């Protein structure tokens, strides 16, 4: 676990523990434990607080703190976030057999990355998308491509295949919390899409360790100061074709009003 927070020579590394050695093994009902070493957050608040806020408005992982010991030696205080897997979508979205997509480049995102999970339609050949998305279900590429095609070419039909209100909540959340290591930022990543029984894709946010302005790359400019982050436009990428899930949704007046209302709700509450 850990794209930028894992270092082989450091003691306090992130952990991803899968309890799959023995059948029916779990810890307090969970079979998958993810522990973040909080490497980029001296406050130790970003991840846990962000998930607490997110869960008021959308499906998102539970999160808390854990003191981690290895072979009796205390390693340190970690944050623990619920893993987004088939058990997660079954628990919250009441299904586990739908198309399930992790929207992160399988090779990781960084300065040299050229493929992003931006939902830009690049034709019907699924191989065009392998470098940007990781399919967690046995099938689902056709459904994901149909979503991108609809965003690009038939936005008025989008509610048939996307839980639009939840997507707008995700955009509002990312903007208010200046959570730019997300779809709203330069790498357009760190979210999942799950296709529910009603054939709508439901977005789920994850990886909050750089929320509240720690990550500064919007994809168009770098917010290098606290002031620039505090004053970030509420319509970030509303007119940018490289972010179709923002641009296309906010091009519809009703959706834009819903998005702004969601932002106001998060700020007020």
Region roles according to the model:
Residues 15, 33, 66, 79, ...:
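Residue-level detector of short, conserved catalytic/binding motifs and their immediate flanks
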Residues 45-59:
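Zn2+-dependent metallopeptidase catalytic core
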């Amino acid at each position: 676990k850990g794209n930028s927070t894992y270092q082989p020579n450091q003691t306090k590394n992130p952990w991803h523990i899968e309890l799959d050695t023995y059948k029916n093994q779990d810890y307090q009902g969970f079979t998958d434990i993810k522990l973040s070493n909080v490497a980029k957050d001296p406050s130790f608040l970003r991840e846990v607080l962000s998930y607490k806020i997110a869960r008021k408005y959308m499906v998102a992982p539970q999160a808390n703190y854990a003191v981690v010991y290895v072979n009796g030696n205390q390693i340190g205080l970690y944050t623990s976030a619920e893993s987004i897997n088939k058990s997660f979508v079954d628990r919250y979205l009441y299904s586990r057999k739908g198309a399930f997509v992790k929207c992160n480049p399988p090779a990781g995102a960084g300065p040299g990355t050229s493929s992003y999970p931006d939902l830009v339609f690049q034709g019907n050949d699924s191989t065009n998308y392998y470098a940007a998305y990781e399919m967690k279900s046995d099938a689902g590429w056709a459904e994901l491509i149909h979503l991108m095609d609809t965003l690009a070419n038939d936005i008025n039909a989008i509610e048939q295949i996307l839980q639009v209100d939840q997507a707008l909540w995700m955009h509002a959340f990312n903007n208010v919390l200046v959570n730019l290591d997300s779809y709203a930022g330069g790498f357009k990543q760190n979210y999942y899409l799950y296709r529910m029984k009603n054939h709508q894709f439901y977005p789920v946010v994850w990886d909050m360790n750089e929320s509240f302005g720690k990550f500064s790359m919007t994809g168009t400019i770098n917010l290098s100061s606290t002031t620039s982050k505090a004053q970030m436009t509420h319509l970030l990428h509303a007119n940018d074709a490289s972010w179709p899930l923002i641009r296309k949704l906010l091009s519809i007046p009703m959706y834009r009003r819903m998005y702004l209302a969601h932002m106001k709700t998060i700020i007020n509450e």
